[in-house]
From Swiss-Prot:
Catalyzes the reversible reaction in which hydroxymethyl group from 5,10-methylenetetrahydrofolate is transferred onto alpha-ketoisovalerate to form ketopantoate. This is 3-methyl-2-oxobutanoate hydroxymethyltransferase. It comes from the Archaea. One of its GO terms (biological process) is pantothenate biosynthetic process. It holds the Pfam family Pantoate_transf. It is found in: Cytoplasm. The gene is panB. Belongs to the PanB family. Binds 1 Mg(2+) ion per subunit.
Length: 284
C-alpha cells in the first residue's frame, strides 16, 4: 500500500494543502512522486495533451487502463487516482462498477467521476465495495457541450446551487474529496466550508483544500494554456533547443564524439577478426 491513502487526504483538510498533478506515463509519474506530490492523477485530459484530441470525449477505457498501469508502476508514495472517461459510467451503475474495477486492477488507488448528484448511486456503490471515489463539479469537461463550452462556473444562483448540491451529494455518498474546476473563488470557498471532505481546485482560487494542474500546462510544454494556469517552467523551449542542437551536431558530424563510442584498442586484432569474418561469409 502506498503511503498516501484516501484517509490521509481526508485528514489533510484544513491542516495541510493537498498537491495534485496529472501524469500519464512512467517517467512523469516517477518525477511527480519524487517531487512529493500527494496525488498523482491519470486524467482523461491525456486525450488532449497526449493524443491531440480537441476534447476529452474520445478517450477510451483502454487508454485509461494502459496509462494507469504505467503510472502505477512508477509511484511508490503518492495516491494514484484514475479518471473514469466519458461513456464508462453513464449508462448504468453496473457498467460504472465494472470499469472502475478495471482501473483499480491496473494499479489505481482510487477513481474520479465527473459530476455529483446525478451519480450518487454509483459513488455509494463503489465506496461500499471498497473503491475510493473523488467527485468533480463546477466545469465538467466531459459535459462541455451541455455547458456551452469551457466557461467560468458559479455566476448564477442556479449554478451555485448545483455546485453545492453536487458536493454535498458526493460527501453523503462517501466520496473522499471533490474537484472544483473553473469556479468563482467565492463559490469554491463556500463549498469548502459547507462540506467535510477536501476540495481540490483547478482555476477555483486559493480558498480550497488543495490544487491540481495538468503536467503539460505547468511545465510549459504547450504555448497555449488555460487562463488559470501558472507556468512553472518553459520546457518547450528547453526541449526544442536540445533537439535543434542534436540535429545540428548530427548534420555536422560532431555527434557521436569520441566519448560516445568504443573501438578496438588493438587494430591488428580487429584486422584479423575482420578477415576471418569476411572469409566465413564468402564460404556460405
Amino acid at each position: 500500500m502506498r503511503e498516501i491513502t484516501p484517509r490521509k487526504i481526508i485528514e489533510m483538510k484544513g491542516k495541510e494543502k493537498i498537491a495534485m498533478v496529472t501524469a500519464y506515463d512512467y517517467p512523469s509519474a516517477l518525477l511527480a512522486d519524487k517531487a512529493g506530490m500527494d496525488i498523482v492523477f491519470v486524467g482523461d485530459s491525456l486525450g488532449m495533451v497526449v493524443y491531440g484530441e480537441p476534447n476529452t470525449l474520445n478517450v477510451s477505457m483502454e487508454q485509461m487502463v494502459f496509462h494507469t498501469r504505467a503510472v502505477a508502476k512508477a509511484v511508490k508514495r503518492a495516491l494514484v487516482l484514475a479518471d473514469m472517461p466519458f461513456g464508462s459510467y453513464e449508462v448504468s451503475v453496473e457498467e460504472g462498477v465494472k470499469n472502475a474495477m478495471r482501473l483499480i486492477r491496473a494499479g489505481a488507488d482510487a477513481v474520479k467521476i465527473e459530476g455529483g448528484y446525478d451519480h450518487k448511486k454509483l459513488v455509494k456503490k463503489l465506496v461500499r465495495m471498497g473503491i475510493p471515489v473523488m467527485g468533480h463539479t463546477g466545469l465538467t469537461p466531459q459535459r462541455y457541450l451541455r455547458l456551452g463550452g469551457y466557461r467560468l462556473m458559479g455566476e448564477t444562483e442556479e449554478e451555485i446551487e448545483e455546485i453545492l448540491r453536487d458536493a454535498k451529494a458526493l460527501e453523503k455518498a462517501g466520496a473522499f474529496a471533490v474537484v472544483l474546476e473553473f469556479v468563482l473563488a467565492d463559490v469554491a470557498k463556500l463549498v469548502t466550508e459547507e462540506v467535510s471532505i477536501p476540495t481540490i481546485g483547478i482555476g477555483a482560487g486559493p480558498h480550497v483544500d488543495g490544487q491540481v494542474l495538468v503536467w503539460h500546462d505547468l511545465l510549459g510544454i504547450y504555448e497555449n494554456v488555460p487562463p488559470f494556469v501558472k507556468k512553472y517552467a518553459d520546457l518547450a523551449s528547453i526541449i526544442q533547443l536540445a533537439l535543434e542542437n542534436y540535429r545540428g551536431e548530427v548534420k555536422e558530424g560532431r555527434f557521436p564524439a569520441k566519448e560516445h563510442y568504443w573501438e578496438f584498442l588493438d587494430k591488428d586484432d580487429f584486422e584479423r577478426k575482420k578477415m576471418k569474418a569476411l572469409e566465413r561469409l564468402e564460404d556460405e
